[in-house]
From Swiss-Prot:
Entries under InterPro entries matching the protein: Ribosomal_bL12, Ribosomal_bL12_C, Ribosomal_bL12_C/ClpS-like, Ribosomal_bL12_oligo, Ribosomal_bL12_oligo_N_sf
A single Gene Ontology CC term: cytosolic large ribosomal subunit
Gene that this polypeptide is encoded by: rplL
Lineage: Bacteria, Bacillati, Mycoplasmatota, Mycoplasmoidales, Metamycoplasmataceae
Organism: Mycoplasmopsis agalactiae (strain NCTC 10123 / CIP 59.7 / PG2)
Gene Ontology BP terms: translation
GO molecular function list: mRNA binding; structural constituent of ribosome
Family membership noted in the UniProt record: Belongs to the bacterial ribosomal protein bL12 family.
Protein name in UniProt: Large ribosomal subunit protein bL12
Subunit record text: Homodimer. Part of the ribosomal stalk of the 50S ribosomal subunit. Forms a multimeric L10(L12)X complex, where L10 forms an elongated spine to which 2 to 4 L12 dimers bind in a sequential fashion. Binds GTP-bound translation factors.
KW Ribonucleoprotein (keyword) present: yes
Signal peptide: none
Keywords tagged on the record: Ribonucleoprotein, Ribosomal protein
């Protein structure tokens, strides 16, 4: 028996009616033991994984916009740091303030830093 090429298979499919294609699909499901619900679950898994990744964010301080003192105070208060540590962190921009925190917490942290005058990015 000659090997069926991809091109000849596609060409044959083009000549079939919709009903014939549906019958072919059903026959393939039976022949290879394909469970359509398992395929749907497997296809949905990457989407759920991507959604999970979006639920945790990192807060990155991009710039102080000339309002370093206010931002140092905000960082000190929000992260419970000593004044010197907060100053070092703000002096070395861009700086990751917190990683892999819940999205709601990241948004709240960003709002307080923006209020102090900072440019903040959530990743």
């Amino acid at each position: 028996m000659a090997k069926l090429t991809k091109e000849s298979f596609i060409s044959s499919l083009k000549e079939m009616s919709i009903k014939e294609v549906m019958e072919l699909v059903e026959a393939m499901k039976e022949e290879f033991g394909i469970d359509p619900s398992a395929v749907a679950v497997a296809a949905a898994a990457p989407a759920a994984e991507a959604e999970e990744k979006k639920s945790t964010l990192s807060v990155i301080l991009k710039s102080d916009n000339g309002k370093k003192l206010a931002i140092v105070k905000a960082v000190k208060e929000l992260l419970n740091l000593a004044l010197m540590d907060a100053n070092k962190l703000v002096s070395t921009l861009p700086a990751t303030l917190k990683e892999n925190i819940p999205a709601a917490e990241a948004e709240a942290l960003k709002a307080k830093l923006v209020e102090a005058g900072a440019d903040v990015e959530l990743k």
